[in-house]
Design a protein with these regions (language model features):
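A short acidic, Gly/Pro-enriched loop at the edge of an enzyme's catalytic core
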Residues: 89-101
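Conserved catalytic/acceptor-binding region of the Class I
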Residues: 128-201
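Class I SAM-dependent methyltransferase SAM/SAH-binding core
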Residues: 34-36, 40-91
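A short SAM/SAH-binding and catalytic strip from SAM-dependent methyltransferases
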Residues: 99-114
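Conserved alpha-helix/loop element of class I SAM-dependent methyltransferases that forms part
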Residues: 12-29, 46
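A short glycine-rich, Lys/Arg-flanked "PGG" loop and its adjoining helix->strand segment in the class I
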Residues: 115-130
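C-terminal helical/coil "lid" or tail adjacent to the Rossmann-like core of SAM-dependent
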Residues: 190-245
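Helix-to-beta-strand junctions that scaffold the AdoMet/dcAdoMet cofactor pocket
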Residues: 52, 110-111, 125-127
């Protein structure tokens, strides 16, 4: 099917996750869709085009700047697509139920209690509806974390290493996703993982990598009370990228279906 709103080919992070989401998502014309952690609209624009003018897509994100950017990109197109600022963990109870709930690179933000946040979100899924979420699961960039922990051990940075271990242990796994969907009564639960390479070079290219520094490397910096030491430490790591590249993320897709409404006898 030709589309005027394809997934951006130049986005090497959000688009591969969105492709995995769409592959699992069972869309139909006229569907009512709630898209959480919508960011700049990947894949909300694509989904809106698929459901068509008889459908509706409500795309929410906690970042007002992202919402304004998405609205600017939208202009007067796809009027059945609505971008709104909001926290997916605290949706208003007056919100209607939807045929589908989607969230690209979203599940790791369901802090602090992911099971509870997922349960709250599922209240907005119609009986017989489908939820599909993606996230970088536990195991993402393991080669980097191993290199960092080895360096911390060599330097006897025990406090920093303990903090890093806590960050890594907090990341959700595919097994967590499967368990929580099943415990919340979802049917036809499917959770899959596939590797996604994230290219990077040494030195400043690594330290200032827009994806890595925007989330993952910050976790290392936050382990240090002394940010001068953190910078010196990470500079040393950046000179040794050959020891932990290629870097691979675990691209996880979690899907489940709400039980259909029981017919009256």
């Amino acid at each position: 099917m030709n589309t005027h709103w394809p997934l951006p080919a130049n986005d090497t992070w959000s688009t591969p996750f969105a492709q995995a989401l769409i592959k699992e998502l069972d869309l139909f014309p006229g569907a009512q869709v709630l898209d959480i952690a919508a960011g700049g609209g990947i894949p909300a624009f694509y989904i809106a085009e698929q459901v068509g003018p008889d459908g509706r897509v409500l795309a929410i994100d906690i970042n007002q700047r992202q919402i304004l950017h998405a609205r600017s990109s939208q202009g007067s197109h796809l009027p059945w697509l609505q971008f709104e600022a909001g926290d997916m963990r605290f949706l208003p109870p007056t919100l209607p139920q939807f045929d589908r709930i989607t969230g690209n690179i979203s599940f790791m933000f369901f802090r602090p209690d992911r099971s509870q946040a997922l349960g709250n979100l599922l209240k907005f899924l119609k009986p017989g509806g489908q939820i599909v979420l993606t996230f970088p699961s536990l195991g993402t960039f393991d080669s980097l974390w191993t290199r960092v922990k080895n360096e911390m051990a060599e330097r006897k940075l025990d406090t920093e290493r303990q903090a890093l271990d806590e960050y890594i242990a907090e990341r959700p796994s595919a097994d967590h996703a499967r368990k929580w969907l099943q415990e919340l009564g979802m049917e036809k639960v499917e959770v899959t993982e596939s590797p996604l390479e994230v290219p990077t070079g040494p030195g400043r290219e690594f330290l200032e990598h827009p994806l890595l520094r925007g989330g993952f490397l910050d976790d290392v910096y936050e382990c240090f009370q002394d940010q001068g030491l953190a910078e010196e430490f990470m500079t040393a790591i950046s000179r040794d990228t050959a020891s932990f590249t290629p870097l691979y993320a675990q691209r996880c897709v979690m899907s489940g279906w709400a039980a259909p409404k029981k017919s009256k006898t």
